[in-house]
Amino acid sequence: MALSDSIGDFLARIRNAQLAMHKTTRVLFSKVNSSILKILKDEGYILDYQKEVVGNIPSFVVKLKYYERSPVISDIVRVSKPGCRCYSKYKDISKAYNGLGIFIISTSKGVMTDYDAHKLKFGGEILCRVF
């Protein structure tokens, strides 16, 4: 069966693994997922990730992060969906949760946070919201 929304599946796997208090989870490999994982690591939402090939299928193993036995990622939501894309100009990008969270945006210059997109004056598709 083909996967229609790889980013949605990726976010659901991370959300479900954190709610179940797993130390690691496995997500499918893609360039967009790689960019999102890099942002999550740089922003301190996950410990680490590495590429792994199992049975000729590439995937990422993500080490999840917890603080005082509760997940660091309390909310990770897909904003732009395959049936309803959500685009924003750089002027219209607001801060997620009054600056406590981030939006991850796909721009013409790659995937970046809302802060970086606003600083570089790039708009784009809002992929997800992380808090």
Curated annotation (Swiss-Prot):
Keywords noted in UniProt: Ribonucleoprotein, Ribosomal protein, RNA-binding, rRNA-binding
A cellular component term, taken from the record's GO annotations: ribosome
InterPro entries according to UniProt: Ribosomal_uS8, Ribosomal_uS8_CS, Ribosomal_uS8_sf
Swiss-Prot/TrEMBL GO biological process terms: translation
Any one GO molecular function term: rRNA binding
Pfam families (UniProt xref): Ribosomal_S8
Role according to the record: One of the primary rRNA binding proteins, it binds directly to 16S rRNA central domain where it helps coordinate assembly of the platform of the 30S subunit.
Oligomer status and interactors: Part of the 30S ribosomal subunit. Contacts proteins S5 and S12.
Family: Belongs to the universal ribosomal protein uS8 family.
UniProt xrefs under PANTHER family: 40S RIBOSOMAL PROTEIN S15A
Name of protein: Small ribosomal subunit protein uS8
Origin species: Wolbachia sp. subsp. Brugia malayi (strain TRS)
